Amino acid sequence: MVLAELGGRITRAIQQMSNVTIIDEKALNECLNEITRALLQSDVSFPLVKEMQSNIKKIVNLEDLAAGHNKRRIIEQAIFSELCKMLDPGKPAFAPKKAKASVVMFVGLQGAGKTTTCTKYAYYHQKKGYKPALVCADTFRAGAFDQLKQNATKAKIPFYGSYTESDPVKIAVEGVDTFKKENCDLIIVDTSGRHKQEASLFEEMRQVAEATKPDLVIFVMDSSIGQAAFDQAQAFKQSVAVGAVIITKMDGHAKGGGALSAVAATKSPVIFIGTGEHMDEFEVFDVKPFVSRLLGMGDWSGFVDKLQEVVPKDQQPELLEKLSQGNFTLRIMYDQFQNILNMGPLKEVFSMLPGISAEMMPKGHEKESQAKIKRYMTMMDSMTNDELDSSNPKVFNESRMMRIARGSGRQVREVMEMLEEYKRLAKIWSKMKGLKIPKNGDMSALSRNMNAQHMSKVLPPQMLKQIGGMGGLQSLMKQMGSGKDMMGMFGGGDK
């Protein structure tokens, strides 16, 4: 999860109010001052922070609140709402449609990670069932075509470019025409970048845009520039019809919050954020789930979406049926470990689970957790079918554990540790017994069927306490809206 430190500081500021006997003006000001410092240190502009602080004070009028109101919860809701408002440009971006050719043109300054982002964007849509293709119209930077070619080949995405042609407009037009004939429904044009905003860059962008008539122009921006993103985004918007922004390198800079809020202030929707060098370190940016994860509240619908990507559609009904029965076997644990490893970076996956802030997984711990999962799977590979399909850990006597340890090259104590993890997960799984399963076995509908009662059973006690108990859980679910919006958090709430 990006901006983990910022999210941790805001969350701690809210939690400190739990230690206060009476929440008065002084307690509220201390909380808001800490949040203000955290936002300013993340390079969010002072006017935006000041406006947010003022709005929260207007919403949370402590003198007007009747006795019996949960002031901490009302303050938390106001903070959530204002953070969403700060990051939301209030304008949706163009979304490509399958089986209909869409041309998307990428623009940006050199060094922002534009070419890599083009491939990530193509790869993301390829996983969603699109037929993407890449066109290299960057004739300015030496090695640009080689880089795009290498990335595209690795991701198994068709590409077009030239080592001899120097006219970017000609390459762009030929590439787009070629892929339209091949029935590609998402044609991505990578254009030249520059070291600074100069007239020749903007003129070339205008010419390529005029010739290819893109459905969407995406501006790629480096997050390290912080609130300076406002001027940069405005400059590009005035030169070409920028319809969306992708912010890169969000994993390595403290100024990401400033960049996000600055771009939102230009009314340009941020559609993705780059969180690392790898192909799957690329997240859809959706304001409510993002803020929810930032504050350690999770993003249940995002988790279900990722799970859907790795669980074949024909296997989803069977998995949901097992979930409703509450019968957890080692084979199910093995399959779910495999799914988790396929879902992308563990830090990102865990931040989608309510009550888990990204700060809870320190840097370097992700690899350790991944290695542990793989060790457990190696041990399970040494089990018999009967052992894997048993839901009774008592079948694992000393001789069986020694056999599994020898077969997997591990210690007996490690086998015992793996079985303890199994018992812990089995306990959580059993609490899902009786969950209403969608008739068509669609996992996305699972979110709508989960109410606060189910979620409170699944969450570990310390996480539930962090959210504010049962009342806090219900309140947070309501914050995300009702109906479709409810999926942005935990799924359907109590009616």
From Swiss-Prot:
Protein name: Signal recognition particle subunit SRP54 3
A biological-process GO annotation: SRP-dependent cotranslational protein targeting to membrane
Phylogenetic placement of the source organism: Eukaryota, Viridiplantae, Streptophyta, Embryophyta, Tracheophyta
Entry-linked InterPro entries: AAA+_ATPase, P-loop_NTPase, Signal_recog_part_SRP54_M_sf, Signal_recog_particl_SRP54_hlx, Signal_recog_particle_SRP54_M, SRP/SRP_N, SRP54, SRP54_euk
Enzyme Commission number(s) of this protein: 3.6.5.4
Domain of life, source organism: Eukaryota
Stretches the record annotates as M-domain: 296-495
Gene Ontology terms, MF aspect: 7S RNA binding; ATP hydrolysis activity; GTP binding; GTPase activity
Keyword Hydrolase carried by entry: yes
